[in-house]
Every structure is written in structure tokens, then in C-alpha cells.
Amino acid sequence: MADKLVKATAKNGDVRIIAAITTDMVNEGVKTHKCAPTAAAALGRMLTAGVLMGAQLKAESDSITLKINGGGIAKSVTVTSYSDAHVKGYIANPNADLPVNSQGKLDVGGIIGKNGNLLVIRDMGLKEPYVGQVPIYTGEIGDDIAYYYVNSEQTPSAVGLGVLVDKDLSIKASGGFIIQMMPGADDLVADLITYRLQEIPSITDLIAKGMSVEDILEFIFEDMDLKILDEGIVPEYRCDCSRDRVEKALISIGMKDLKEIYDDGKQEEVVCNFCNKKYVFTNDEVGSLIKRLENNK
């Protein structure tokens, strides 16, 4: 089933929903970083969480960055997403892998670890970005996002994230949802949704069966006044790096470090963490950056 993100409500607007199929998007990210199976599941869940949370942003230029580091062998996983559903991300150790857990599933919590924090940075073009941080709850990512919403934004939320990795390391199915109760919503509605989520198959099973994102929501919210609010948008893995941005990043390291690079007499290679694109600066070009920095004093 094709990738798609939709927004919806249920129970006369008491329930807010964002849901997406992200199979192709996650496949692109995992392929870019050549991930081992468990690393692929971890990165895929984070990319899906990012694109779902990014859909809540208002302005086109707004962005949200998620970073999780629990002291496990994955080290850290970072994603940045935008309101138009494009996302980029990387896992510091793409080779992180463990045997399946006791439920027979990829041990994402095991490679993430629990000794650390989930960081959420919202950049809305203000002087300072909004930064929220919570301790890692389970390391399974979906639980940690839900824990963040309750503790940092006081919004009770159910977060489901799933990535099914095939034998050839491609992504067979990926998707997720964020379900949030609005202020004043009946507690019985929350109980009903919790019960249904416990009873239904995983989101990856539903996607693998060929269900669309609308089909999945109709299945979960049957007889609950589900309203799909838009035609949906296509999530996309896309890096927006450029030589100009890399130049600015090099300049930002400061005169002292730039002069050390220049005095070495070698070219400088910078690799983008998000897409692995290489940017090469000759020694003369590094010298030009130093001159530009001197002229801006």
C-alpha cells in the first residue's frame, strides 16, 4: 500500500488522530544508512514518529527534531521533520543489532537502552526553539513518545509505531499513529480506544495485508464517528543539505579551527549525517572561508 499521512477526528472531535503508512519513506532512510535489521527498525520508528509529529506543525518553515539516546549500542538516533511530511534522520551506529526479544520481535529497546533521554526540539522561527526532554521510558520509541506527550505537553496519547524488516533487509511494512484525547473528553472513550488497540493486530500486520491508512482508521474507530479531515500527503525521506549550508557550518567552527585545517595544507571533506553526501573543500577554498570570516569581523 502506498505511503500516505492523514489527519482525522473521532467521537465528535474529542479524539485527534494522525496516522501514516511510511514503508517507502523508511525504506529510503534505511537504504541510505545501510542499517542492520534492529537498527533499521529503530530508525524507521523514529522517522515515522518524526513525520507524525511534524504534521502537527503550523508553518511551512517550522521543524521538529527528535533525538533519543539511552546508552545502548545504537548510540543515538536523530530525525528532523517538517510540516510538509518530509523527514531526514540517522542512527549513530547503523550496524546495531541484537537477537529477537522474548516476543520474537526485533529488540529496539535493547539497542536503544533506557539510561538516557528523549529530546524534542520544536523550531518555530522564534528567537529560541522550544525544547522538551523526558527520561526514556522503555526505549521502544512509541512508548517514549507517548510518555513525552503526557509529561511535557500534558496530552494523554496512544502512540503506535511499527517497522517490519524483510529477509533481504528491505522494509516490508512501516507505519504509525498518534491518537490524542482532547480536554474534556470522556474517560470511557479513552478506555474503549485502549481496549481496541490491545485487541487488534499490529499496524505492520494491517499494512502488510494491504490495508490503506484510511482502512486502518476505519477498523480502529468503527462506530466512533471517524472523520478524515484531509486528502492526505505523501511522507518522503529527503535531505535538504547543500554546499552553502556546509560552508556556513565550517565557518561556525571558528577562526582557530579553520586555520588549523588550512595550515595542514590538505583538503577538508565533510559528510552529511543525514544522507552521507560528501562535500570536499580544497585548501584554497578553506582559505577563502577564513578571509570571509575576517571580513565579517
Swiss-Prot record:
Top-level taxon: Bacteria
Disulfide bonds: 239-241, 272-275
Tagged with keyword Cytoplasm: yes
Pfam families on file: HSP33 (PF01430)
Family membership: Belongs to the HSP33 family.
Species this chain originates from: Clostridium acetobutylicum (strain ATCC 824 / DSM 792 / JCM 1419 / IAM 19013 / LMG 5710 / NBRC 13948 / NRRL B-527 / VKM B-1787 / 2291 / W)
One GO molecular-function entry: unfolded protein binding
Main location: cytoplasm
InterPro entries per the UniProt record, alphabetical: Heat_shock_Hsp33 (IPR000397), Heat_shock_Hsp33_C (IPR016154), Heat_shock_Hsp33_N (IPR016153)
Coiled-coil boundaries: none
Subcellular location as annotated: Cytoplasm
Record keywords, A-Z: Chaperone, Cytoplasm, Disulfide bond, Redox-active center, Zinc
PANTHER family linked to this entry: 33 KDA CHAPERONIN
Post-translational modification: Under oxidizing conditions two disulfide bonds are formed involving the reactive cysteines. Under reducing conditions zinc is bound to the reactive cysteines and the protein is inactive.
SUPFAM superfamilies associated with the record: Hsp33 domain, HSP33 redox switch-like
An annotated GO cellular component: cytoplasm
Keyword Zinc: yes
Protein name, per record: 33 kDa chaperonin
Cited function: Redox regulated molecular chaperone. Protects both thermally unfolding and oxidatively damaged proteins from irreversible aggregation. Plays an important role in the bacterial defense system toward oxidative stress.
Single biological process term from Gene Ontology: protein refolding
